[in-house]
Amino acid sequence: MSGLPLLSLAIWVPIFSGLVVLLTGSDRNSPLARLLALLGAIVGLLVTLPLYTGFDTTSPAMQFVELMPWIRRFNINYHLGVDGISMLFVILNSFITIIVVIAGWKVIESKVAQYNAGFLIMSGLLNGIFAALDGMLFYVFFEASLIPLYLIIGVWGGPRRVYAAFKFFLFTLMGSLLFLISLIYLYRYSGGSFAIQAWQQMPIPMIPQQWLFLAFLVAFAVKVPMWPVHTWLPDAHVEAPTGGSIVLAAIALKLGAYGFLRFSLPIAPDASHEFSWLILGLSLIAVVYIGFVALVQEDMKKLVAYSSIAHMGFVTLGFFIFSPLGMEGALVQMVSHGFIAGAMFYCIGVMYDRVHSRMIVDYGGVVNTMPKFAAFFMLFAMANAGLPGTSGFVGEFMVILASVKFNFWVAFAAASTMILGAAYTLWMYKRVVFGAVGNHHVEELTDITSREFLVLTLLAIGALGMGLYPQPFTEVMHSSVDELLRHISVSKIQ
C-alpha cells in the first residue's frame, strides 16, 4: 500500500465522497445520503492509517511525498508530503469527520445530503492544508476550507447564524489578504518558486523577516484564535450546529497554530525570536484573562468556546519557548484538544437536542435522568480541566515544565489556567448535572441512545488513550520537532 498516493487519497476520497452524497438530491433520499457519507468518512480514515504504520519515526524529512506540475507558467506544483507533525493532524481530521457524520445522523433533518457533503469536502480540504508543500497549493486549500464551514454555520446554524458566519468569514479573510501578499513576496524573492521547503532554507534579511512574521501573525492569530482577534469564535460556536462546533474546535482552530510551524518559525526564525515576547504575552493573556471570561459565562457553548481559546494559548506558548519539551507539549495539546473540545461540544449538543437550551440555568439534576450521559460528561469535563490520566493533562504539563526552565513567572501564569480550567468547567458541570432541576424538560429526559453512546465512547478512547499512553504520539513527532528547533536556532541573516 506504500506505493499508493496516500496523501492524494486522503484529500480526494472525502471530496469525491461529498460530491457523490450531493447527487442523492432531496431529503427523500436522506437515509442513502447518511449511509454514503458514513461510508466515505470511514474510507477516508482507512486510507490515512498507513501514513502512521508506514511512517519512519527516526527521519525528520517529509515522507509520502507526491510532486507533479500544476500551473507551469508560475511554477506552481501539486506538491504533498507529511512529517511527524502534520501526519497526526491528517489522521485526527479524518477521525473527527466520522464523528460529525454520526453525530448528525438523526439530528439534521433538512438538506441532509448537502450537510454531510459539506463536512466531507471540508475534510479533504483540511487534509490538503496539512499535506501541502507548495505555498500556493496551501493557500488554495486554506481559503477553500472556509467555504464549507461558512455554509454549515450559515445554513444549519442558530437564529443569528448569518451574522456569525459572516463575522467568521470576514475575520479570516482579512488575515488571509496579508498572507497572500507574503506568499507573493516570497515567490518573487526566491526567484519564482512556491516551494515551502525552499523558502525555509533561503537567507532573508532581518527587515523582510520582521514584515513577513507580522503578516503571518495576523493571518494565523485569527485562526488560532489569539487575543484580541478571538471575538468571532464564541459567536461562531454558539450559532453553529453541533457538528460544525466539533470540527471548528477539533480541527479548524489548529490551522493557525500549524501555520506558525510551517511558515512563521522556519521562514522567519530571527524575527520569531525577536517577537517571541509578543507571542508569549498574547498567549498568557489568552491563558489567564480568557479563563476568567469563561468563568462568568452562562451559555455552555460560550464557556467551552472561551476555554478553547485558553487551551490554544498553551499551544502558542509552547511554540515560542523554543524547547523540545514545550513544542512537543503544544502539539500534544493540539491533538488532545481535538478529542476533548469535540466531546464537550457534542455533550452540549446532546442536551440541546432534548431541552433546546444552552443556558446553564435551564438545567440541573441531569444525573437523575441521564446517568450514562452524566458519567461521560464528567470524564470530558475532568479532561478539559486537565485531570492526570487524561489527554488534557499531558500537553499542559509538558508546556508548564518547559516554561519553568524558560521563566518561572511565565510558568506560574500558565499553571494558573489549570486552576481556572477546573473552576469554570466543574462549576458548569455541577450546575448542569447536579443540584435542583431548573427545567421541567429535564425531568422527562431520556438517557443517551446507542448512536450517542458510540460517539462518546470513540472520543473517550481518544482522550483516555492519549492521557494514559502518550508515547505513540510523541514518538512520531520527536524527530520533526528536533529538526524544526535546530533549523530556527540558526540565523538566516547574511
Write out the residue ranges for each language-model feature.
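Hydrophobic alpha-helical membrane-insertion segments
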Residues: L39-G54, T172-I181, A383, I419, ...
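Transmembrane helix-loop-helix hairpins at membrane boundaries of multipass inner-membrane proteins
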Residues: M1-L6, V20-A117, S193, Q197, ...
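Alpha-helical transmembrane segments and their helix-start/interface "positive-inside/aromatic belt" motifs
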Residues: S30-I42, Y163-L173, M370-F373, S450-L458
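Cytoplasmic juxtamembrane regions at transmembrane-helix boundaries
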Residues: I102-G118, T242, A250, H441-R451
